[in-house]
Amino acid sequence: MLRLVLLLLVTDFAASHETLDSSDSQIMKRSQFRTPDCGHFDFPACPRNLNPVCGTDMNTYSNECTLCMKIREDGSHINIIKDEPC
């Protein structure tokens, strides 16, 4: 019985270690996201140009300024995944 418990613990540890490794690779990918440059926009209005960006919250914003407005309103931390719709 003790051997079975030890075997289950070792198996569980190995599985959690693999999960940790895969989440580490996700963190590396996240560090490659672009931080929006919110300092050069005149709030509360944004230009109406359509230049979509995909945020790390998986929402598409019509341009970088609208993403910055969302960050300003919510205080959330959203980076840009890509310069196109999600």
Curated annotation (Swiss-Prot):
GO terms for molecular function: serine-type endopeptidase inhibitor activity. Gene3D superfamilies: 3.30.60.30. SMART domains: KAZAL (SM00280). The record marks 48-49 as: Reactive bond. It holds the Pfam family Kazal_1. It is found in: Secreted; Cytoplasmic vesicle, Secretory vesicle, Acrosome. PANTHER family: SERINE PROTEASE INHIBITOR KAZAL-TYPE 2 (PTHR47608:SF1), SERINE PROTEASE INHIBITOR KAZAL-TYPE 2, SPINK2 (PTHR47608). It comes from Mus musculus (Mouse). GO terms for biological process: acrosome assembly; apoptotic process; fertilization; male germ cell proliferation; male gonad development; positive regulation of apoptotic process; seminiferous tubule development; spermatid development. Expressed in sperm (at protein level). Expressed in testis but not in ovary, brain, heart, kidney or lung. Within testis, expressed in epididymis and germ cells. It comes from the Eukaryota. As a strong inhibitor of acrosin, it is required for normal spermiogenesis. It probably hinders premature activation of proacrosin and other proteases, thus preventing the cascade of events leading to spermiogenesis defects. May be involved in the regulation of serine protease-dependent germ cell apoptosis. It also inhibits trypsin. Residues 32-86 form the Kazal-like domain. Its main location: secreted. GO terms for cellular component: acrosomal vesicle; cytoplasm; extracellular region; neuron projection. PROSITE patterns: KAZAL_1, KAZAL_2. Disulfide bonds join 38-68, 46-65, 54-86. Residues 1-16 form the signal peptide. Keywords: Apoptosis, Cytoplasmic vesicle, Differentiation, Disulfide bond, Protease inhibitor, Secreted, Serine protease inhibitor, Signal, Spermatogenesis. This is Serine protease inhibitor Kazal-type 2. On the 2D-gel the determined pI of this protein is: 5, its MW is: 8 kDa.
